[in-house]
Amino acid sequence: MGVPVIRAMRARFALAAATLAAATLLSADPVAYVLNGPTWSQPQTAYRINTANLDLPALSVETAVRSGANTWEQQSAAFRFVYSGPSSQTTNTNDGINLVMFRNASSGSAIATTYWWSSGSRIIDADIVFWDGAFQFFAGSSGCSGGFYIEDIAAHEFGHALGLGHSTSPNATMYPSVSACNTGNRTLDADDIAGVMALYPRLLVSAPTGLRVVP
């Protein structure tokens, strides 16, 4: 049986001044990471979670998704995701609400899909769908059997949500495939860190001038 692919299905359509897109890029460039182009305009982006699913209690899902999002704090770029509470929404649409949800359906070999909308050079909305009808999801780091840990799948999908495509480095969180019960995605590879730093360079604050320390 082949290894399921984590991918974001590519779809484009006009929606006011926005474009719906999804990260499906693969790179032949010597640099392993791939930048999709648009970025968020603010250093913090809020998201909500609809925890309704077939496999786990709501609190376990919330904790696991938040852990996956927090994976992207393992670097010093000028960007982070911020959890803003639960949601009952069940559709992914450009509504200004960045949503993570589970759907009792399948989408080919995709374990999860990230949809994002952009206006010009800025991402304005991103939604993540876990395909709960096709795969079983687990939380934590033990007990998984033939399924996938939410933490690791979420880490990959939040990478798409911040603007990264698929890396060609097999050790990267943003590599396009993952084996069952893998726990490696929750730790960023140097390639992932380089990618997010390229999108959101660290802000350097200069020390004030004209000051002296008086002993």
What are these regions (language model features)?
Residues A14-L25:
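Bacterial N-terminal signal peptides
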Residues L25-S206:
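Zinc-dependent metalloendopeptidases
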Residues M9-F13:
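N-terminal Sec-pathway targeting helices
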Residues P4-R7, L204-P215:
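Enriched but not universal
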Residues M1-A8, T24-L26:
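Short, Lys/Arg-enriched N-terminal segments with co-localized hydrophobic residues
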